[in-house]
Amino acid sequence: MKLLGAPASPFARKVRVLALELGLDLPLETVATATSVELPLANPLAKIPTLLRDDGPPIYDSPVICDYLNALAGGALVPASGEARWRALTLEALADGLCDAAVWRRGEMLRPEVEQNAAALAKQAAVVERALDALEAQVETFTSFGVGEIAAACAVAYLDFRFAAEPWRPTRPKLAAGYARVSERASMKATTPD
């Protein structure tokens, strides 16, 4: 079993952190989405992360991979049912949406400035701000470290990595404190991108 992804991808990092927390060995094979021959054969969407299994067809996207790995390991990082499951998956969706907006912004900002869509950049920046505010409002979730908290930690870590000039901590002290605690976990340290 191996994960096709990139060290800087917050979605691949979420999967890698979850795998480490579950005690699973999940090698990362770094692929370039634009040029990889293997990726579109495994995932017709040609998106990362994609999980290549030894005993079945590939699995994608990151929420499905996390659910699969949790089931494979008999873990409790993705609750099986009830309100706890819906809360965890909703928190994961919030963090993933933040990442979607941030990754899109990063790609757009790599284009020549005259070709950038300023209105779309502003819209996605607003999505990030609203998501951060929502995380601040529910930061008590960092008292545990399940799939939702892992996704949230990887999302704000991505902002630190790609948008260091846009500090999010000053107006979100509870989120900052919660993230400071979980960022010390071995799984987070082992997956920090260069």
Language-model-detected regions and their locations in the chain:
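GST-like domain detector, emphasizing the conserved glutathione-binding G-site
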Residues: 1-119
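Hydrophobic/aromatic-lined pockets within catalytic cores
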Residues: 70-74, 160, 164, 183, ...
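Charged/polar, low-hydrophobicity segments characteristic of intrinsically disordered regions
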Residues: 137, 182-194
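Non-transmembrane alpha-helical segments in soluble domains
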Residues: 66, 70, 89-92, 132, ...
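GST-like fold's C-terminal all-alpha helical module
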Residues: 95-180
